Structures are given as C-alpha cells and as structure tokens.
Design a protein with these regions (language model features):
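A short acidic-Thr-Gly-centered motif at the start of a beta-strand
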Residues: 43-53, 363
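C-terminal region of N-terminal signal peptides and the immediate post-cleavage residues
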Residues: 22-43
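Noncatalytic scaffold domains of N-terminal-nucleophile
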Residues: 99-135, 145, 154-159, 163
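N-terminal export and membrane-targeting signals
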Residues: 1-17
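A post-motif C-terminal structural segment
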Residues: 54-56, 65-70, 75-117, 163-459
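Structural beta-sheet core signal
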Residues: 59-60, 156, 375
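Active-site-adjacent structural elements in enzyme catalytic domains
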Residues: 53-69, 74, 135-151, 161
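Secondary-structure transition into beta-strands, especially the periplasmic turns and strand N-termini
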Residues: 151-153, 368
Length: 459
C-alpha cells in the first residue's frame, strides 16, 4: 500500500514527459526503483537512447548564475510573473558543483577552474586547476578535444578573457588558472615549453586550432613568446601563422569568412559589461534604476548574442557537406564578476545578455532539431533577494524594477570591502533536443560531460 502514491506520481511524471515528446524507457515508466543519491531517475531516463543522436551541441554557461541570480534578473527585467528565455526550456534539473582536494575529498565550494574541468572532462579536480588531475597534475582529455577527434567543428565564446577559467578548460591543461599568457607562467613551471610542457593557456588555445574563439584577453595574446617554435612573436602572431583570421570589433567579426579559424579579441581584458549602476553598500542604497549602457564599453564591441549568432554561422558553414556537426560553448562570464563586486546592475545586465544568447541558440535548435541546447551555471553565488524592511549585514542595494516594484538585493558572503564569494549550492541545468532528458533530477556537474559525449556519440 505504501508504494502506490509514489507509483502514481512516477506514472504521472512519465506521462508528462511523453506529452512533451520525450521518449520514456519502460524501466522508468514501470519501476519505482531509485538510489539514495537521487541519481536513479536520470540514469533510467538516459537508458535506451543510444540511437537518439545529436548532430550539434550548444552549451551556454552563466558563470555564477545560481537560482538567485536568475530570479533577480527575471524580477528586474520581465517581472516576477514573467519568464526569461532560459526559463522556457522543456526539461530542467539541478546539479551539484563541488570540487575536490588533492586527496579526492570534497571541497564544498568550487571555483570556475575546477567546476569547468568537471563538465569538460567528466572528472573532479582541485580549485584553480585547468583540466588536470587533482593529485598527479596530469592532463585529462576534454570534451572539445574529443569533438575534434571525431571530426566536429568547435567553438568557444565568452565575455571574459579567452584565457579565463571557463573557456580555458576546453582547449588547455594548466596546473594553475593564472598561467594565462607566456608572461604569466610563474605558477606553472612544468607547463612551460622549455620544460616540455604545452605553454600558456593562450598558446594552447590557438595550438588546438579551435575553429571559433571569441572574447576578451587581447593583452594576453599580445604577450611575447619566449620559448619554442614561435619564440620572439606574440601569441596573436602565432595564431595568424596557424591560419587564424584575427578580428577586434563587430565589423571585423561580420566580415570573417568560413574556411579559416577565427580569433576575436574584443577587449584587452574582460569585455566591459553592458549595464551600470551603484554598487551595493553597507546600510543599503537609495532606490535606483539600472543604466542600460556603459561608457567603458567601446563602440564596435559585439554583443554576446551577435557573437553567438556568428559563431553558429561559421561552424555550420565549416561543416557544410561533411555530414558532421559542431560543439559550441558560450559563456556569460561577468554575472560572476559583478556578483563578486556586489554590483547588482552589472550582474543583471550580463544575465540579460546571456539570456539573449540563449534565445539565439534556441532559435537555431528550432530550425535544426538535431541540436542539443543546454544552459547551466558553473557554480552559485552570493546575491540574495531580501525583504525591503530587512537590515541585513553586508552590502545591500534597492532597485526599482521594470514593473515598478522595489527589490532589495544583499551580498553577505564576505567582509565588506573584500570580494564576495561563491556559494556551494546546487544550480539549475535545463535543456532541449536529443538526450535532453539526461539533465532531469539531481545530477553532478561531471555528468554533463557524459550527456554531451553520449548525445554526440563521441569516441
């Protein structure tokens, strides 16, 4: 008797999935088995889908975009009852994000290097490390490398420096995330070319011949190479010798043509954010509206959605007639960076920018239903929506939303005056397309690697 309500709920869940057009294995529809970790439902749902192949995968990462950050952007931009583009995916789950120490024991709050390594390689590592093992510091094969081996086109788009942790995990292996350019190798002596290593993150990224690399970090690529085949030149010059078209603004990006890889460098450092406003403060701020412009953002800086659209065009054109598809990662990086700075307007604007890129990706998938689109975060972050009458510790700001309401956001994960910190909570993962059902339930970040590998049948 005690199992009947559970079975009714399970059957209803299976029926809902069938109504949404998702094939449900008999094991899931008829069985109430599951494990204590909460992994049972996703494992069952993923069974029997070997023939359900994706030609393309688009992975969109909101750096630091926990549920609180999504809710804040939704409340401000489209209203509490509204829905963002990222809210419209048919299938949604959550995943855990912890990293590990050098002995493999959980470190409950990850950084972006370890979290990115999780989905890029399917393995946990220590904070600060880029796609290398936690104890022995050995390179681990990434999803982008597998995609290349299987003949897929590949791309990485970010609003951070292209050498920042999240893009770096795809096409480089580094002992420490700080080893961005040839002049930044202090923390990675064994990775230097002189020691037989692969060089800096910037050098590795172009050596990997990723078809589309778009983001910031021009200053890293303009550093001089001091060792190896390209000694004496800059990483940008190395890229050009390897056949890259190098572009630095929206006009150059628009004119980039398929047939040669593209390196887009749109800022010396991180690409400046789209929105500005007063940072949160002790005791709060006067109610403010965000300014939807930024004087530090140069004219001619392409938006994240425009970069995503162009990347899709280039990757599709490269594969025309081959029968093979592509893997593209798109990162909204400064959600995290403005969260660290307790800057609600900057944070909301960058979430809105990623949401427009999500719209582009979903539109592409609507026209190409063999495309798996996934959106998620690397980790959760600090911002919390609190009652207007509350006087919380830390830093607060009151915003006047687009629907005319007042909203108070608080940042209290570190002492005022210091950068706010990541949090260790699970984050949303949502998807549509072939094998999207794998994101359902509570999974772990490392399982995203398996989802993509399975959908693309990478070997």
């Amino acid at each position: 008797m005690g199992s009947r309500p559970y079975r009714r709920r399970l059957a209803w869940g299976a029926a809902a999935l069938l109504a949404a057009g998702v094939a449900v294995p008999a094991a899931y529809a008829a069985s109430d088995s599951g494990d204590a970790s909460g992994q049972g439902a996703p494992a069952a749902l993923s069974a029997g889908h070997g023939a359900k192949k994706a030609k393309n995968v688009i992975l969109l990462i909101g750096d630091g975009m926990g549920d609180s950050e999504i809710t804040l952007a939704r409340d401000y931009t489209v209203g509490a009852a509204g829905r963002l583009n990222m809210d419209k995916f048919p299938l949604t789950g959550s995943y855990t994000t912890y990293s590990v120490d050098k002995n493999g024991k959980p470190d409950y709050v990850t950084d972006s290097a370890a979290s990115g390594t999780g989905w890029a390689t399917g393995q946990k590592t220590v904070n600060g490390r880029i796609s290398k093992t936690p104890g022995t510091d050995k390179p681990m094969t990434t999803i982008l490398e597998l995609a290349q081996r299987n003949g897929l086109a590949t791309g990485s788009v970010t609003t951070a420096e292209l050498t920042d942790a999240t893009p770096a995990v795809l096409a480089s292996h580094a002992t420490d995330r700080s080893c961005a350019g040839p002049a930044d190798m202090k923390a990675c002596p064994s990775d230097t070319v002189a020691k037989g290593g692969p060089g800096s993150i910037a050098e590795q990224s172009v050596n990997h011949k990723v078809d589309v690399l778009l983001g910031g970090g021009k200053a890293r690529f303009d550093q001089k190479i001091t060792e190896g085949r390209f000694k004496g030149g800059t990483v940008t010059q190395q890229a050009e010798k390897l056949g890259y078209q190098v572009v630095t603004d929206d006009k150059g990006l628009k004119n980039a043509r398929p047939g040669k890889p593209v390196l887009g460098l749109f800022a010396d450092g991180n690409v400046p954010v789209e929105w500005t406003g007063k940072a949160a403060a002790q005791g709060g701020t006067e109610p403010q509206r965000c300014v939807t412009s930024n004087p530090e953002r140069k004219a001619g800086t392409p938006s994240l959605d425009d970069q995503t659209r162009k990347a899709l065009q280039l990757l599709e054109a490269k594969q025309k007639g081959s029968g093979k598809g592509f893997f593209l990662q798109v990162e909204g990086a400064s959600i995290d960076k403005r969260d660290h700075a307790a800057d609600p307007c900057g944070q909301i604007g960058e979430t809105a920018a990623l949401d427009r890129a999500v719209k582009v990706a979903r539109a592409y998938a609507a026209a190409h239903p063999d495309t798996l689109v996934i959106t998620t975060a690397d980790h959760a972050h600090t911002s919390q929506i609190v009652p207007l009458e509350a006087t919380p510790p830390g830093l607060s700001s009151t915003l006047v939303t687009n629907e005319g309401g007042r909203l108070k956001v608080n940042y209290s994960t570190n002492t005022p005056g210091k950068a706010q910190e990541h949090t260790g909570t699970q984050v949303r993962i949502a998807a549509q397309g072939p094998q999207a059902e794998r994101v359902l339930g509570v999974t772990d970040q490392t399982q995203l690697f398996t989802t993509i590998r399975s959908a693309l049948t990478l070997r």
